[in-house]
């Protein structure tokens, strides 16, 4: 009882009882759009398709304005989970035949699916009939857009895929698509630099927050020493590691060893050649390297454990030491390693170690802008305007997605339940697609189908695939992650503390930072002063240290699906209060809105040399899994085993080319 009273009192202090801007409802209708789908006790599907009226057609339907739990929102995964568990068809009933026939059906409305529709039309005819199905209440897949209006001012954030970048140069096909929809990255980057506003937070530093649960005491340490690569953080006025560490609650042994690790130039494998060193480093984790070769005290590990979360969704216990060398983590400065990549490196690390032409840009809503511009190209009435710049503040009209007579149509809240050839795959002229939408089942037919959904679902919806291909599709386990955005009424606490963000290696979210201004077109997000509202970004990648990488991801899936929004909100408020409290931050007063973009199935699984085999060319699971099957081909980032937008586009191009080669166009 006493514990419950303490919990209730703490909740009041955090503001759990305070109203925040919550838009889980539009026009009195609860979202997500699939909330009534099959599941425990929800009853059977119906089959009445006559005069159907769907959520996306209603006036005011606008998912980017929703807050609360987003990403894979409730209702978006019911059908998929029922198919996985083998109980969907028990209550599904007989699908209603829409009598619709298309040239192409695309399952999955993310960037890969939209690109597949674009490439198909370009390869065939401007009047090609295409239907795109997606299980979420918004298009874009992981490339989602979040909108906030603190104080009545429009602020935009990405709810998933963040930027136009890749470890390797974009292919001609991916680059050509970008240019065709109006994205000229060098020009956009130059315009953003001319627009300025990036000096808004000039003079402010990063900070570290050490939490008592992990490090023995709550302590905010402003500034970060060192500099250099992605793994090191920013500089802090020439402060040495030894000086900075004295401000932390870390033990004397940990402080001594971290300073040694960061500053010393030691060859920890002096008897090995360059190639032998790289091979050895590829077969041990960075944690093992620190403990067994650098000989750090075990109390050092928590300081570095979560540093690889943002790239891999797992900690340094499950990421190879050679990967961390590629990202300039400490400990390798004296090992005299040549700068070349090796075959025993992940896709991302291999790219980071390979010189290439830089290609990088971040829209305010991340790659949701790529999806929106693709939608403009496919269905012009969806997004007004003519340029990438004017698209940022343009409001999408979702009622235009599925118009009678339009050559290209998109149906949201529509989960594919079965995809199979009408007849034998080798000789069939059509493919039948059954999908669930708002507690009804429908069928359509097409000359060809591109499955641009997640690989692990394909064996459940396309049961006729060969067993070896199904096994390959099941191999990759998508990386769970959370992108949380918090709208604050002001950033006075940040200003008072002299910081832009806080690294929190031991907390529920591993950091928080104010969103940098991203001026483009008419959009201006830079606050005039500390009294103006800002957006703060947080990330979480649940995992279970000690297990192999794929098992850690599975544990993370379960964690995210079982965690209610209230748990996220409580942890967010607690983290803000503890990290920024000394600057006067009051979570009950200063938080305006919270959006948690929950992605239990987030990044495409990238092969990890520490855990995965060295497959021969053409024999990796993604290559075996993406083989065409009759009039069905596969496009998604899983098919490349690389979580990058250009890879998703390249796989779409390949999938459409395979349809053409099979004469399915």
Language model features: what each stretch is:
Residues 1-20, 47-50:
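N-terminal secretory signal peptides
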Residues 17-18, 24-48:
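N-terminal export signals
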Residues 56-93, 147, 212-214, 218, ...:
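Conserved flavin/dinucleotide-binding core of flavoenzymes
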Residues 103-118, 133-136, 416, 448-455, ...:
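Conserved beta-strand->loop/alpha-helix structural units within folded catalytic cores of enzymes
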Residues 256-414, 425:
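Active-site/ligand-binding neighborhood in enzyme catalytic cores
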Residues 412-547:
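Mid-domain catalytic core of redox enzymes
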């Amino acid at each position: 009882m006493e514990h419950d009273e303490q919990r209730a009192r703490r909740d009041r202090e955090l503001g759990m009882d305070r109203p925040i801007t919550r838009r889980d409802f539009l026009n009195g209708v609860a979202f997500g759009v699939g909330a009534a789908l099959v599941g425990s006790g929800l009853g059977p599907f119906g089959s009445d398709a006559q005069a159907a009226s769907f959520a996306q057609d209603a006036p005011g339907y606008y998912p980017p304005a929703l807050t609360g739990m987003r990403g894979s929102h409730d209702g978006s995964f019911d059908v998929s989970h029922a198919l996985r568990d083998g109980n969907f068809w028990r209550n599904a009933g007989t699908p209603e035949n829409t009598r619709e026939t298309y040239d192409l059906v695309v399952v999955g409305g993310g960037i890969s699916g939209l690109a597949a529709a674009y490439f198909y039309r370009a390869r065939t005819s401007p009047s090609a009939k295409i239907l795109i199905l997606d299980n979420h209440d918004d298009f874009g897949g992981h490339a989602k857009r979040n909108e906030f209006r603190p104080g009545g001012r429009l602020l935009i954030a990405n709810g998933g895929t963040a930027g136009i970048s890749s470890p390797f140069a974009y292919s001609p096909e991916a680059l050509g698509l970008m240019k065709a929809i109006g994205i000229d990255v060098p020009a956009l980057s130059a315009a953003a630099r001319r627009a300025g506003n990036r000096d808004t937070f000039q003079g402010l530093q990063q900070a570290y927050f050490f939490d008592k649960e992990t490090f023995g005491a709550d302590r905010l340490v402003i500034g970060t020493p060192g500099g250099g690569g992605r793994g090191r953080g920013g500089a802090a006025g020439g402060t040495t590691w030894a000086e900075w560490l004295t401000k932390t609650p870390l033990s004397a042994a940990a402080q001594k060893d971290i300073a040694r690790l960061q500053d010393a130039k030691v060859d920890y494998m002096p008897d090995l050649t360059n190639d032998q060193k790289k091979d050895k480093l590829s077969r041990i984790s960075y944690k093992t390297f620190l403990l067994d070769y650098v000989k750090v005290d075990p109390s050092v590990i928590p300081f570095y454990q979560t540093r690889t979360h943002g790239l891999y969704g797992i900690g340094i216990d499950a990421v190879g030491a050679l990967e961390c060398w590629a990202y300039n983590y400490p400990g390798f400065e004296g090992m005299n390693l040549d700068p070349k990549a090796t075959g025993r490196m992940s896709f991302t690390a291999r790219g980071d170690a390979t010189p290439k032409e830089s290609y990088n840009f971040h829209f305010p809503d991340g790659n949701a802008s790529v999806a929106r511009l693709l939608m403009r190209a496919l269905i012009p009435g969806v997004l007004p305007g003519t340029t990438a710049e004017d698209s940022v503040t343009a409001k999408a009209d979702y009622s235009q997605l599925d118009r009678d007579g339009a050559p290209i149509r998109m149906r949201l809240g529509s989960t594919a339940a079965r995809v199979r050839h009408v007849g034998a795959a080798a000789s069939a002229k059509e493919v039948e697609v059954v999908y669930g939408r708002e507690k009804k089942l429908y069928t359509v037919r097409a000359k060809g189908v591109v499955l641009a959904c997640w690989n692990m679902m394909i064996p459940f919806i396309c049961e006729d695939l060969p067993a070896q291909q199904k096994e390959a599709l099941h191999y990759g386990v998508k990386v769970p992650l959370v992108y949380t955005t918090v709208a604050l009424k002001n950033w006075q606490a940040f200003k008072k503390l002299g910081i832009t963000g806080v690294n929190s290696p031991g907390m529920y979210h591993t950091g928080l930072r104010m969103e940098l201004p991203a001026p483009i077109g008419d959009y201006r997000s830079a606050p005039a002063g500390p009294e103006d509202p800002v957006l703060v970004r947080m990330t979480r990648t649940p995992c279970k240290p000690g297990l192999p990488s794929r098992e850690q991801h599975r544990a993370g899936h379960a964690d995210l699906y079982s965690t209610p929004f209230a748990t996220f909100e409580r942890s967010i408020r607690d983290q803000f209060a503890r990290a920024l409290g000394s600057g006067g931050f009051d979570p009950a007063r200063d938080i305006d809105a919270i959006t948690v973009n929950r992605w239990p199935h987030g990044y495409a699984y990238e092969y990890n040399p520490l855990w995965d085999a060295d497959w021969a060319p053409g024999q990796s699971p993604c290559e075996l899994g993406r083989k065409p099957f009759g009039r069905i081909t596969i496009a998604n980032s899983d098919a490349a085993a690389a979580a990058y937008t250009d890879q998703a586009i390249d796989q779409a191009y390949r999938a459409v080319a395979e349809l053409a080669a099979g004469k399915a166009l």
